């Protein structure tokens, strides 16, 4: 089962739901109040983070995809703050600003990374007219592949049946993070993701996996869902689909620091993976992995694509030096996800000399990692004649790998490295000599992918052929 993270940035998601502002006051405490038996916190720092449905959208944007957010907020300063924070993180906002309610705000008082108190500033949204939100959802739908409904039970989704019908009618897959004891209102969605407590509140106790699967399938069929995902804390997750055996995944959490926002991460990554073309099993595996990472962070937190990739492939990352093509492709992909700029060049490098070293050092300065593709022995013979190479491929690769400028060395046997370069897709393709960029093998593929092609000068008076001729003249 292969999970390709590089396609995630192509996904477009619309999140609709209860938008909140999570505010944190951090401070130290060393005494008890003389007024009441409570600690006194000397506040030294204040922090604001998007919460609720806004945290779902933020998780999606942090992984490089396009996220839009629709929700109900007040006509107040906190709504302005939320919009600014989200748009700074590339989340498009479709807020319905109601004069009837304040923006939902949760204030947490923290000391030594422990929550001492939470204060909620909110009014019920159940009685207000949210037609304005429906109109904003309809405006945002054409630009979305998947719709996520993030229900915190605050009332923003008091027209949830209409929203599901509208999105499904537009051909969009709909994911729901549910709330409450009435799941019937989510009928017709693609998948819902209750936690075990929410699930058992609706279907009754599930003492074992078999009971959970049986009751889950019954609920899935009743609600006409494609799938049902039950998140089970330390027991992981269970996916139930029509015509398939239940899929039980163990938790990936090594350390649980704070479960705040974990459900947001699960449904955000799940929707992202589905929008990018993955199936339910692959998407659930990725969401489960992401949940295990985010609970190790304090407060409402997001993940980067690099963190997710490292967790997924950390034990498979390639060592530097000589490498096979498939391993190189994975290594370059990992480097890019870490934000590193990859440079690639190629050649025979039969007898390594000072000109080669200067050229490779110049190439390395154009990025963070340098890949050198080396002609194998047969292709060197075809290019240079039957008496070449002087040094066999293994020795040439070993010498190149010993240079501080070179990160990976990979062989190729074709007449040109065009196919290999198109597979690797470096950020910068480099060639020495008097070539035009458009004439360099592989350059077209690199430029089409948004990379660049650079031509560097060789050091005058130094070449492998000249060195060989000099040696032969002296021996003669």
Curated annotation (Swiss-Prot):
Q: Where is this region: Ribokinase?
A: 1-318
Q: Which Pfam families match?
A: CTP_transf_like, PfkB
Does the record carry Calcium as a key word?
no
Q: What class of enzyme is it?
A: transferase
- What EC number(s) would the UniProt record show? 2.7.1.167, 2.7.7.70
Q: Which residues form the active site?
A: 264
Query: What InterPro entries does the entry give?
Result: Bifunc_HldE, Carboh/pur_kinase_PfkB_CS, Cyt_trans-like, PfkB_dom, RfaE_dom_I, RfaE_dom_II, Ribokinase-like, Rossmann-like_a/b/a_fold
GO molecular function annotation: ATP binding; heptose 7-phosphate kinase activity; heptose-1-phosphate adenylyltransferase activity; phosphotransferase activity, alcohol group as acceptor
Q: Which UniProt keywords apply?
A: ATP-binding, Carbohydrate metabolism, Kinase, Multifunctional enzyme, Nucleotide-binding, Nucleotidyltransferase, Transferase
Cellular compartments per GO CC: cytosol
For the keyword ATP-binding, the answer is yes
Pathway noted in the entry: Nucleotide-sugar biosynthesis; ADP-L-glycero-beta-D-manno-heptose biosynthesis; ADP-L-glycero-beta-D-manno-heptose from D-glycero-beta-D-manno-heptose 7-phosphate: step 1/4; Nucleotide-sugar biosynthesis; ADP-L-glycero-beta-D-manno-heptose biosynthesis; ADP-L-glycero-beta-D-manno-heptose from D-glycero-beta-D-manno-heptose 7-phosphate: step 3/4
One BP annotation, GO? ADP-L-glycero-beta-D-manno-heptose biosynthetic process
Q: Where does ATP bind?
A: 195-198
Reaction it catalyzes:
D-glycero-beta-D-manno-heptose 7-phosphate + ATP = D-glycero-beta-D-manno-heptose 1,7-bisphosphate + ADP + H(+); D-glycero-beta-D-manno-heptose 1-phosphate + ATP + H(+) = ADP-D-glycero-beta-D-manno-heptose + diphosphate
**Region Cytidylyltransferase: which residues?**
344-476
Query: Family assignment?
Result: In the N-terminal section; belongs to the carbohydrate kinase PfkB family. In the C-terminal section; belongs to the cytidylyltransferase family.
Q: What does the protein in this record do?
A: Catalyzes the ADP transfer from ATP to D-glycero-beta-D-manno-heptose 1-phosphate, yielding ADP-D-glycero-beta-D-manno-heptose.
PANTHER family the UniProt entry points to? BIFUNCTIONAL PROTEIN HLDE (PTHR46969:SF1)
**Subunit details for this protein?**
Homodimer.
Q: From the Swiss-Prot or TrEMBL record, give the protein name.
A: Bifunctional protein HldE
> Origin organism of this chain?
Chromohalobacter salexigens (strain ATCC BAA-138 / DSM 3043 / CIP 106854 / NCIMB 13768 / 1H11)
Q: Which gene name belongs to this protein?
A: hldE
């Amino acid at each position: 089962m292969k999970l390709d993270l590089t396609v995630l940035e192509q996904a477009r998601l619309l999140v609709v739901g209860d938008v909140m502002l999570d505010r944190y006051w951090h401070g130290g405490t060393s005494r008890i109040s003389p007024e009441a038996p409570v600690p006194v916190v000397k506040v030294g720092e204040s922090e604001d983070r998007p919460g609720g449905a806004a945290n779902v959208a933020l998780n999606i944007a942090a992984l490089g995809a396009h996220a839009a957010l629709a929700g109900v907020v007040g006509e107040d300063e906190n709504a302005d703050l939320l919009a600014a924070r989200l748009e700074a993180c590339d989340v498009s906002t479709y807020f319905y600003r109601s004069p009837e309610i304040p923006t939902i705000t949760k204030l947490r008082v923290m000391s030594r990374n422990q929550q001492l108190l939470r204060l909620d500033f909110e009014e019920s949204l159940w009685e207000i007219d949210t037609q304005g939100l429906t109109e904003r959802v309809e405006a945002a739908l054409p630009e979305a592949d998947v719709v996520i409904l993030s229900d915190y039970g605050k009332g923003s989704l008091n027209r949830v049946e209409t929203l599901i019908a509208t999105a499904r009618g537009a051909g969009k897959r709909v994911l729901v993070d549910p709330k409450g004891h009435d799941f019937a209102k989510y009928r017709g969605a693609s998948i819902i993701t209750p936690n075990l407590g929410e699930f058992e509140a609706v279907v009754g106790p599930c003492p074992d996996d078999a009971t959970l699967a049986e009751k889950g399938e019954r609920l899935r069929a009743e609600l006409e869902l494609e799938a049902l995902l039950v998140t089970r804390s330390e027991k992981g997750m269970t996916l139930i689909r029509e015509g398939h055996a239940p899929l039980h995944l163990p938790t990936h959490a090594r350390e649980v620091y704070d479960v705040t926002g974990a459900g947001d991460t699960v449904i955000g990554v799940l929707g992202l993976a589905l929008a990018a073309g993955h199936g339910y099993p692959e998407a659930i595996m990725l969401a489960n992995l992401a949940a295990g990472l985010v609970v190790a962070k304090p407060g409402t937190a997001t993940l980067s694509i690099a963190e997710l990739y490292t967790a997924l492939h950390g034990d498979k990352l390639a060592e530097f030096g000589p490498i096979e093509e498939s391993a190189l492709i994975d290594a370059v992909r990992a480097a890019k996800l870490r934000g590193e700029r990859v440079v690639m060049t190629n050649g025979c490098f039969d007898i390594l000399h000072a000109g080669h070293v200067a050229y490779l050092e110049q190439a390395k300065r154009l990025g963070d990692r340098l890949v050198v593709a080396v002609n194998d022995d047969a292709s060197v013979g075809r290019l240079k004649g039957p008496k070449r190479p002087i040094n066999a491929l293994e020795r040439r690769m070993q010498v190149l790998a010993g240079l501080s400028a070179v990160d990976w060395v990979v062989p190729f046997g074709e007449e040109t490295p065009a196919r290999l370069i198109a597979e690797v897709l470096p950020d910068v393709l480099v060639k020495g000599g008097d070539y035009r960029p458009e004439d360099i093998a592989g350059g077209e593929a690199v430029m089409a992918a948004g990379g660049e092609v650079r031509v560097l000068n060789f050091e005058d008076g130094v070449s492998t052929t000249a060195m060989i001729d000099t040696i032969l003249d002296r021996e003669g």
